[in-house]
Amino acid sequence: MCSSDLRYAANAPRLFAAAGERRQQLRDDLALRTAQDVADTLGTMKGVLMKIGQLASYVDDGLAPPARRVLSRLQDSVPPMSSELAASVVVAELGAAPERVFREWDPLPIAAASIGQVHRAITADGQAVAVKVQYPGIAETIAADLGNVALIKSLLKMAVPSQDVTALIEELRERIREELDYVREAENQRQFAAYFDGHPTARVPKVIDELSTARVITSELAAGARFSEMLGWPQEERDLAAETIYRFTFRSLYGLHAFNGDPHPGNYLFEPGGQVTFLDFGLVKHFTPAELEPLLQMNRDICIDHDPEAFRRTLESAGFLHQDAPVSTQAIVEHLAVFYDTIREPGPLTITSDYASSVVRRFFNLRSPLAEYMAIPQSYVILQRINLGLFAILGELSATADWRAISEEIWPSVRAPASTPMGQAEAGWRARRRPIAA
């Protein structure tokens, strides 16, 4: 759910208390009423380009102004479905009108969801749920348009003109195809929910299996403050939220061997004490042990062993750096140090928005002598979105922590003792779930 503020916050005492207010906000004349409206709005490559715009949104600061303007237009949100069209999807997928499937059903969407929208409902047994409904026909439309490699290539070459974007295109196409499949998304969400079950601060809503299909996902309704609201909280609370997001990200990588590839402010809900609920698992990258090992080795090379030459060899063997590139090892380390500056040395460090923007600008510096010799292997394309997106989130929070100490708790080769109260609580969780939680 990566557009709008994702008005998932459920602080009203009754499920439908804000329906009247939302009716005033909903522009009914702009609602998509039929499957043909969906095809007209998101067909002829517009849906694919929107998805690429969303996936590439984290590189805005690294692009030239003309490319930035194009990317901004691609990120425009899609009009909501009319209540009748959304209901027709529920009928097709769940076998009956939403008012019959659910005890209560809010016909107006409470959130945008990239290629669909989210409705509040109450199940027959009284559970409050969020029902994510996909635009009818959008999966087929975008899947067909993914064959237009030439147009996709021309767009990506704006961002990385010095690189061969073939592998980048293939990875983006594969990830977009997966995001169209709500069965896969629901399975991703189940995996994350099972892994983080009982975690002291990170929560993933459970999927309601019997009410989920290829076009509908029904989950527990999550409550909490939106990101924009949480920014007004005391800095101590923002630091705790940032620590949870950081731990969630890297526990996922090293424990589940998976990344939720959409670190977007709209995908989090917050409660005091560092409690964060994580939403939307359509874009998840799973790593094999062979794909994960170079990432672990680069951490060891640069942060633990302080061995620049070994770091260079690992980059070359993993495909990030051309073999025998005519650039110094020092230049390579300086170029990629942006991803390690926060964890190379112990001690508190504040990540600011300016710093996060500088990471993007430095990494996508097309004038760098390394630009023509660097590459992003297909397996790691989404990794860069996650890294840069995470920096952007932490920067907005002006988050301060000893990121190195927290990382040492998580790195499989170190597994240091807890360095914070949250780390102590997490260690207890891991001890209780040792067979599952890495």
Regions found by a protein language model. Give the residues of each.
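Hydrophobic HxD+1 residue recognition
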Residues: 261-265
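Helix-rich C-lobe and terminal helical cap/extension of kinase-like folds
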Residues: 17-22, 26-28, 32-33, 59, ...
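ATP-dependent phospho-/nucleotidyl transfer catalytic cores
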Residues: 72-79, 91, 139-147, 152-259, ...
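N-terminal accessory/targeting segments that precede structured cores
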Residues: 1-117, 143-165, 371, 401-402, ...
